[in-house]
């Protein structure tokens, strides 16, 4: 039998905690026998003293085991269970293409996703722009969609990693969010509860990333890869660029529109294609669905070219109670803003840098995101036709097209877009889209 305050004292004094102590504390969070003050105290001691790798693995596993862990054995699936997690950014719509692409190649993708908060968009919000789309199917329906379609994208239910919800809420108000062991456990507890065989992490780097520096992004990627593999899930990570909006659009309905056009081959933004392909390759390799990089890329290109990936996306939408002909008639189903017009730079120049976080906040100010978790979202608004780093812009060549529902919010977003762009007379240095692959 342990005492919560003795566990806090031990960590406060810089000593490593045992697996049993960590499990006791996490179960106490779940069962409401550990107080908010005690959660805050432990979070702060971890923030200052860090955790050893065995502690990190124990924390992650205890948080995973605080709720239901999905078990797929009874379905006798004929392929691996694989997923992707992104630390979030702006215009990061990869999940909507990646899930169907991997499923079309023989994988099963039980993706439990999140909502947007602050400047980062949320996959669930994007999907809810589709009329009728149900992000909370019951357990049996979720399993059936995975078995029949190969991919489902759903929200976190209260039975998955419940200790994380309470732990995170306390961290959020006690300046202990940015602790690598705590971030790692929070991300992985939910992902490992999916019962995966393999996972790929997309850790963003740059002005729109969660972590403020390349070094911290790399540290987080390394920590997640180490802990996930230590917990028995084959995991790799890619460090990818978020110094500019990833897709050509940012918002909800506008990104779904871009995802469908990507899958059907109507238009594929080159940077979005590169990141999506790289992540899918990792999933195919880790899941044993391809023998090497070239084989994986050939398989993925084939399911894009022959329409199989687009077909899987359409079947997922229908299975999750969206329209049965969504891929064919997406434009008639997705909400459109009443006011769509371009925003121009006030002078001529080359875009040498952009504040991607500020561009994400421009979408929020249009109503397309949340400042607080309880905020409602306007699915129709956003940015399209985003200019890229190195583009020449002037009073004729726009920075973006802003989709708003009134003149006032259009004007505010226009001001935010203009001030997020740095113009100069020479092109910026070209940086990679994928910086680094991290394995154990």
UniProtKB/Swiss-Prot annotation:
The protein's annotated pathway: Pyrimidine metabolism; dTMP biosynthesis via salvage pathway; dTMP from thymine: step 1/2
Keyword Glycosyltransferase applies: yes
Gene Ontology cellular-component annotations: cytosol
Protein's GO biological process: pyrimidine nucleobase metabolic process; thymidine metabolic process
EC number annotated for this UniProt entry: 2.4.2.4
Gene3D superfamilies, A to Z: Nucleoside phosphorylase/phosphoribosyltransferase catalytic domain, Pyrimidine nucleoside phosphorylase-like, C-terminal domain, Transferase, Pyrimidine Nucleoside Phosphorylase, Chain C
A Pfam cross-reference name: Glycos_transf_3
Keyword line: Glycosyltransferase, Transferase
Reaction catalysed by this enzyme: thymidine + phosphate = 2-deoxy-alpha-D-ribose 1-phosphate + thymine
Source domain of life: Bacteria
Record's keyword annotation contains Transferase: yes
GO molecular function: 1,4-alpha-oligoglucan phosphorylase activity; thymidine phosphorylase activity
Chain segments annotated as transmembrane: none
PANTHER family recorded: THYMIDINE PHOSPHORYLASE
Subunit structure: Homodimer.
Protein's job: The enzymes which catalyze the reversible phosphorolysis of pyrimidine nucleosides are involved in the degradation of these compounds and in their utilization as carbon and energy sources, or in the rescue of pyrimidine bases for nucleotide synthesis.
Family: Belongs to the thymidine/pyrimidine-nucleoside phosphorylase family.
Name recorded for this polypeptide: Thymidine phosphorylase
Organism of this sequence: Serratia proteamaculans (strain 568)
């Amino acid at each position: 039998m342990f005492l919560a305050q003795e566990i806090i004292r031990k960590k406060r004094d810089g000593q490593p905690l045992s697996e049993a102590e960590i499990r006791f504390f996490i179960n106490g969070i779940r069962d409401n026998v550990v107080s908010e003050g005690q959660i805050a105290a432990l979070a702060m001691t971890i923030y200052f003293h860090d955790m050893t790798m065995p502690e990190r693995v124990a924390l992650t596993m205890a948080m995973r085991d605080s709720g239901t862990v999905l078990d797929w054995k009874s379905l006798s699936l004929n392929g691996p269970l694989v997923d992707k997690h992104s630390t979030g950014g702006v215009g990061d719509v990869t999940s909507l293409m990646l899930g169907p692409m991997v499923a079309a190649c023989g994988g099963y993708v039980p993706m439990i996703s999140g909502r947007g908060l602050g400047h980062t968009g949320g996959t669930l919000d994007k999907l809810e722009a589709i009329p009728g789309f149900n992000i909370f199917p019951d357990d049996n329906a979720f399993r059936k969609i995975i078995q029949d379609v190969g991919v489902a994208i759903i929200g976190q239910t209260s039975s998955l990693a419940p200790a994380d919800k309470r732990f995170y809420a306390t961290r959020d108000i006690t300046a202990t969010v940015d602790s690598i062991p705590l971030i790692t456990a929070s991300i992985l507890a939910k992902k490992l509860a999916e019962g995966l065989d393999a996972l790929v992490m997309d850790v963003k780097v740059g002005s729109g990333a969660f972590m403020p520096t390349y070094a911290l992004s790399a540290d987080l990627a390394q920590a997640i890869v180490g802990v996930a593999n230590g917990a028995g899930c084959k995991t790799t990570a890619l460090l990818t660029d978020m110094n500019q909006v990833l897709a050509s659009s940012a918002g909800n309905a506008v990104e779904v529109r871009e995802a469908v056009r990507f899958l059907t081959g109507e238009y594929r933004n080159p940077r979005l294609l590169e990141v999506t392909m790289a992540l899918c390759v990792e999933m195919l390799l880790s899941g044993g669905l391809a023998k090497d990089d070239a084989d994986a890329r050939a398989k993925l290109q084939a399911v894009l070219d022959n329409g199989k990936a687009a077909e899987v996306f359409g079947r997922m939408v229908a299975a999750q109670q969206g329209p049965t002909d969504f891929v064919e008639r997406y434009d008639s189903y997705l909400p459109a803003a009443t006011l769509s017009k371009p925003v121009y730079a006030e002078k001529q120049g080359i875009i040498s840098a952009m504040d991607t976080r500020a561009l994400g906040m421009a979408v929020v100010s249009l109503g397309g995101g949340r400042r607080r978790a309880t905020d409602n979202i306007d699915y129709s608004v956003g940015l399209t036709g985003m200019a890229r780093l190195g583009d020449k812009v002037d009073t004729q060549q726009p920075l973006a097209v802003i989709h708003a529902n009134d003149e006032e919010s259009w004007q505010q977003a226009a001001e935010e877009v203009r001030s997020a762009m740095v113009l100069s007379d020479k092109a910026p240095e070209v940086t990679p889209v994928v910086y680094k692959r991290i394995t154990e």
